[in-house]
A protein has these predicted regions:
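N-terminal "arm"/small-domain region of PLP-dependent enzymes with the aminotransferase-like
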Residues: 1-45
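Conserved PLP-enzyme active-site core in the AAT-like
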Residues: 7-9, 13, 47-249
Length: 249
C-alpha cells in the first residue's frame, strides 16, 4: 500500500450503507471492553494539540521554563518568532535568533549555560529556506540540548527530521497535513533518542520529582516516554489546548 493510499483511506472501514467519511462523535469519553484494549491506543512517541502554535509552545516549554534560553533560527514563521520573542519572554524565557546559514562557530557563540534547546523549521514559512538539520542537530547535541524541528511545510511525506538527527518534531496539522481547509490542530513527535538523565542538571523538570504528579521523576519512571508523558500529564492537564471533536476526525 502506497503512502498516498494510506493517507486517504487507512484506519476507517465503513460497512454496507455506512458513511465513507469517519463520523464525528461529540463525546469526551468512550467505552472499551478492557484496559488492555484501551492501552493499545496510546504510544509514547507523540501527542496532538489544538493548533500548531500550541504544539510549538508545549514542545519548548516542556523543557524550557522561566530562566531558560533557546537558540532559534531567525528564518521561522512569524507566529513562532513572536511566540519566542514576545510571549515566552514575558514568561521568563530568553531567546537568541541566529542566521541558520551561519558558520558552526557563529552558531556555537549563541549558546549559554542556561540554553535548553535549539529550534528551527525544515522549510521556513514563508521563505521556504531549507534547514540543515544534520548541522543543527550536531551543534545542539554538542551543547547537551535537543533539537526541535517544525516540519509543517515539508510534512512527513517529504522529510522525516528524526532520520537526520532531530530529537523532537512539531507540526501544524492545520496546513499541509490537513489541507488548511477542514480543521485546526497540531502535533508533537518525540524520537525518544535524547538522553535526559545524561544532562540531568539542565532538565530538572524531567529528572527531579514532580510535586504535581505524585513525586514522579519522569526520566527515571518512563525512560524514552519521559518527554511526552510530562507534556501530557503536566502541560496538557494544566493548560488545555486539546483537540476538539470537530478537529479530530
Amino acid at each position: 500500500m502506497e503512502l498516498e493510499t494510506k493517507a486517504i483511506h487507512e484506519g476507517w472501514k465503513p460497512g454496507n450503507g455506512e458513511p465513507r467519511q469517519l463520523p464525528i462523535y461529540e463525546s469526551t469519553t468512550f467505552k472499551y471492553d478492557s484496559s488492555e484494549e484501551m492501552g493499545m491506543l496510546f504510544d509514547y512517541a507523540g501527542m496532538l494539540t489544538s493548533s500548531g502554535q500550541a504544539a510549538n509552545f508545549f514542545a519548548i516549554f516542556n523543557i524550557c521554563e522561566a530562566g531558560g534560553h533557546v537558540v532559534a533560527s531567525g528564518n521561522i514563521y512569524g507566529g513562532s518568532y513572536n511566540l519566542l520573542s514576545v510571549t515566552m519572554k514575558k514568561m521568563g524565557v530568553d531567546v537568541t535568533f541566529i542566521n541558520q546559514d551561519a558558520s558552526v562557530e557563529e552558531i556555537n557563540a549563541a549558546f549559554k549555560e542556561n540554553t535548553k534547546c535549539m529550534f528551527g523549521e525544515t522549510l521556513s514559512n514563508p521563505t521556504m529556506e531549507v534547514l540543515d538539520i544534520e548541522k543543527f542537530a550536531s551543534i545542539a547535541h554538542a551543547h547537551g540540548v535537543p533539537l526541535i524541528v517544525d516540519n509543517t511545510f515539508a510534512t512527513p511525506a517529504n522529510c522525516q527530521p528524526i532520520k537526520w538527527g532531530a530529537d523532537i518534531v512539531t507540526h501544524s496539522t492545520t496546513k499541509y497535513l490537513d489541507g488548511h481547509a477542514s480543521g485546526v490542530g497540531g502535533a508533537i513527535i518525540d524520537s525518544g533518542n535524547f538522553d535526559w538523565m545524561s544532562h540531568a542538571e539542565k532538565f530538572p523538570g524531567l529528572t527531579t520529582p514532580d510535586d504535581s504528579y505524585h513525586g514522579i521523576t519522569y526520566a527515571k519512571r518512563f525512560g524514552k516516554a519521559a518527554y511526552i508523558t510530562k507534556a501530557t500529564a503536566q502541560l496538557m492537564r494544566d493548560l488545555g489546548s486539546i483537540p476538539s471533536p470537530f478537529n479530530s476526525y
